[in-house]
Amino acid sequence: MRAAQLFTLTTLALATSPYLQAEEDTTETGREQTLQTITVIGTKETASSAVKGYVAKRSSAGTKTDTALLEIPQSISVITADQIKDQNAQSISEALRYSAGVTAEPYGVDNRGDYYALRGGSSGSVVLDGLRLPLIGSWGSVHDEPYAFERVEVIRGPSAVTYGQNPPGGLVNLVSKQPQKTAQHEIAIQGGNNDHRQVAVDFTGPLDQDGTLLYRFVGLTNNSGRQVEYAKVRRDYIAPSLTWLPDSKTKLTIYGQYQKDESGNTNAFLPWAGTRLDAPGGYPKISSRLFIGEPDWDSYGGQRTRIGYSFERKLSDDWTLRQNLRHDNANGHYTTMYADCCGWMGPRPSDRTVNRVWYAGQPTSDVTSADLQLEGKLNFARFEHTLFFGVDSAQERSTNPSVSGLDPTPFDLYAPVYGRFAEPVADFGVISPTRTTQVGISVQDQIKFDHRWVFVAGLRHDHAKVTVDDSASVGVDESAWSRRFGLVYLADHGLAPYLSYSQSFEALAGTDFYGQTFKPKRGEQYEAGVKWSPIGKPYMLSIATFQLKEKNRLSTDPNNPQNQLQLGEVTVKGFELEGNARYQNLEVLGSYTYTNARDTTGPVKGTQLESIPKHSASLWAKYSFALADISGFSVGSGVRYLGRNWGEGAVIDVPATTLVDALASYTQDKWSFSLNAKNLFDKEYVATCLGRGDCWLGTRRSLVGSVSYRW
């Protein structure tokens, strides 16, 4: 099996090599020819602009300044809107499937949110246009709609200097679609298996003849099923925005967003036996369509509103002032049932039945985030400085009341009977809000010497405070300094080796079983790598190796399962390879990740971290035909290798699997037609099994047809 998987990946890689070699041959031949001068009129790429194809050259994700990716001493991926569209990503987690250093969808079919692990860490933080989203996560949240974004940027490794509190593995920055000066309109309709139905619109352009007022409106409605029965999904989303350009030095954008999600629950927490292990009594594997809740009671979703603005003023040719503010309000609900199988390390007590646990929660969150940025450029002799000074804050008021209990009625996993559950009255009692505040001050200098050397240094101070209203428990009040240093050498032919050191800081709310507060979680990383992106060529290749250490990681107390100890320390050593390229009509992107993530001091010392594979790889290619008789046709295919992973303490493993995706599309004038297949061969697999006794099944085949009209 491994040989077949490696052969598939190698074959796809070799299939693309003649095109890349042809580019080199053409370049060499061109040196001996006198070519006609051609004037090209286009839009210069910026850190937030749309990108044609899959290759982005600039980003602000790593520095909060508009910087070439070659000059950032950190591993960063940019997933463009074209890639999201071509791969028909229906969630942020799906958009991350082909990125290096990311364990996407570790819980398989899970509609509770976007889950992924960066460099062996827990799910990374998410920021929207550089501003933090809720600081305290909870079940019942509304996760983001990928159609709304121009880019999804993955910043790997500690990023406290740039963003404040975040896990050491990294974070994801979502870049919203912005109003444009050129009028563009799109209407897109989708339909597919599992009753997938979706209509989306994206309109933008000027509102006046002078182009001082620009607008954008993004809207979507989705009414679909899932591979799990009774888990219907309904989403409504609108995002209007308006940009005012009173002069060439000033820009103000005001925006809003409303999203409402309603669905059944896809999560089942299925037992080992019947998923990863053989079912007892000669029964078959548990169906991936099994709904383990109650159709008339289970619900998951909520609504979210956002409103904010971004302001930019050029004070001079060298200095720019930026200010951003956003308010997020979210109200969720989560009523569900799942299998009571935690703690079982073998077959179920019965051949075909389990008991179920019921859960009800109503999380809420109000977050106000703001920042003030000053960027300046100073030149001294052979030195070019890009200075950045920033102040940011985030204030959140959240509640997460929940109750749960055990339903003693046995549930048949092979012939489920619904309607016998006596719905409980969820009494949440007195609800005490949690208030979280973060304030950070940062300074950074990007120094370029002789157009060859780039040195990046940054320093940040964070103050984080967490309190619970009407509670006698001790809150969190922590401060910390974080640093980053990096060096890049800009060699000839677009080659850029680099070294970097960075830190992370994250205050941990709550106490242990005995009432003692937790220390902040800290992380530090050493990274070395090479990037390659020739000037004027749509190529971007990056290679990185790193060692990341996380301190004060929480671990379960082996003597008291209800307690958590801060004895854990995790060391992650890894290697990542990622490349994006376009040659004429061929677009290719690929990645390979090696992650050795081990607990070095906890109760399961020396074992690979739960759900994190050591090896993973992916390759995607799209070819657009240019011949007259088939002009407008495109075909694409991708291979995803998901390596073997383990439950906590390596008590159970999940075998590796290889999945295939495919695309066929046709564009004629203003019309586009496409068909996407994900998990083309409908492979049934287990995504993850936890050491406590439960497993998650992977996503089955998805077929979606799309029709869009653009003008």
Where in the sequence are the language-model features?
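Acidic/polar loop-and-plug regions of large Gram-negative outer-membrane beta-barrel proteins
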Residues: 222-226, 238-314, 329-365, 409-438, ...
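Structural signature of Gram-negative outer-membrane beta-barrels, strongest in the C-terminal barrel
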Residues: 243-247, 365, 384-396, 432-550, ...
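Membrane-embedded beta-barrel scaffold of Gram-negative outer-membrane proteins
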Residues: 312-326, 330-336, 497, 521-582, ...
